[in-house]
Structure formats: structure tokens, C-alpha cells
Amino acid sequence: MMNPLIIKLGGVLLDSEEALERLFSALVNYRESHQRQLVIVHGGGCVVDELMKGLNLPVKKKNGLRVTPADQIDIITGALAGTANKTLLAWAKKHQIAAVGLFLGDGDSVKVTQLDEELGHVGLAQPGSPKLINSLLENGYLPVVSSIGVTNEGQLMNVNADQAATALAATLGADLILLSDVSGILDGKGQRIAEMTAAKAEQLIEQGIITDGMIVKVNAALDAARTLGRPVDIASWRHAEQLPALFNGMPMGTRILA
């Protein structure tokens, strides 16, 4: 039997009805023809940004990571574990998929500690207990997990969703796909790079070809590949017809090698 698969959703996917329709149609097709257990992990930067804008709150980033002051963590939790998570559950319901909404702290699935005081309520994710999610998977549910976590001291933390997905993949012994707006990592000429090693990534970062949020994504994928001891795919949701093959292990974007 294949390992479970974690599909991490990112970019504007949550903001686009067309993207969600393509994704959930592909999930329905895949679940009808394959037995592989699936888990969705999501962030929702665009949902948070819209909310912050509406509330006239500043968005600060440091090295591609969102700074989360104490007076903003409740708002961000509401956006990610509330709006973003329940939007995905609503799409699952619309497509007759039995889904369960979770956050990283449920069942202690992912352990979270504070990453850096300067970043505020931003968490570092580490593997936790697989019991709850395995139980849901065994009963045919699709877990949909937001990237909000909680420390042992009971502090809510905003966790980078790529890193949250990596920690959960390590917890479950699962494979990982990072789905976003881009078809993979592009070279300086806009061409997709099929495979990427750490050395190649460092070279492209030095050359300024991989920048900003993509640095965080590539580093998260490299970290994931090292942690999991197997390749991690960065791919796009745009080609819905290719998604079932991607979910089954066919490389469609950039395959990150440990």
C-alpha cells in the first residue's frame, strides 16, 4: 500500500473558485479510483492579508515569514483555522467528500514551539502523534488541517504552512506535495526545473533567481526531503487533469531531492 499523501495548498488557491473547483474535482476523481489516503494542509496568506487590510493592520514580514504580534494572533487564527479551513470543508461537502477540519494542536498531531521572539506568535513545527489523523484516515475521512498550532504553554502560534505540512508528513510517514500557483521552480528563462538538489538551490538563490517567498518554499521542500528521506514535489493546481497522476507519484512540477 502507498504511503499516505499530504497535499499542501498555497498561493491564491484559497482565493480562487476556479482553482478550488479544479482541485476538488481532481480529488473526487482520485478518491474514486485510488485507495491512497490523503490529507490536506493549508495556510491562507491571502485570506489573512485581506482581513488585515480591511482592519487597517500592517503586514510585516521578516525573511519571508509573517511577523505575528500578540494583538494579531487571534485575528490570524480566525482567518486560518476559521475562514480558510471552513471554506475548504464547504468545498469538500459540495463534492460529497467526508472531511474533518483540524488544527495542528488537535490530537497533538504536530508539536509547536515559539520560533523566534522577534517574530512574535510564529511557531516552529515538529512531528507529534499520528493517532488522531490515522484514525480519521482509517475511517475514510479527509483531514483538512490549518497551519495554526499551540505550544505546551497554551499559546496559539502561526506556523509556516510548508513547514507545518513537513512536520505532519514526518508524523504520518507520508509523502508530500506543495501545491501552489507556479508549475514548479523556474530557471532564469522562465523554464520549469524538473529536479532540484540543495546545491542547485543554493546556486540559484545566490544568483537571485530564487527570491523572497520562493526561498522559504524551496528551503521548506529541501528540509522536507531531508527530514522525510524522500523527494518532495512542488507543483501547480492549474492543470487539474494532471493532478490525479501527481497524487499517484508522477512528477509534474519540480521534484526536490534530499
From Swiss-Prot:
It catalyses: N-acetyl-L-glutamate + ATP = N-acetyl-L-glutamyl 5-phosphate + ADP. Pfam families: AA_kinase. One of its GO terms (biological process) is L-arginine biosynthetic process. Belongs to the acetylglutamate kinase family. ArgB subfamily. Homodimer. The gene is argB. The lineage of its organism: Bacteria, Pseudomonadati, Pseudomonadota, Gammaproteobacteria, Enterobacterales. Keywords: Amino-acid biosynthesis, Arginine biosynthesis, ATP-binding, Cytoplasm, Kinase, Nucleotide-binding, Transferase. GO terms for molecular function: acetylglutamate kinase activity; ATP binding. The record marks K8, K217 as: Transition state stabilizer. SUPFAM superfamilies: Carbamate kinase-like. Catalyzes the ATP-dependent phosphorylation of N-acetyl-L-glutamate. Substrate binds at G44, G45, R66, N158. This is Acetylglutamate kinase. It comes from the Bacteria. Pathway: Amino-acid biosynthesis; L-arginine biosynthesis; N(2)-acetyl-L-ornithine from L-glutamate: step 2/4. Its EC number is 2.7.2.8. ATP binds at D181, V182, S183, G184, I185, L186, I209, I210, T211.
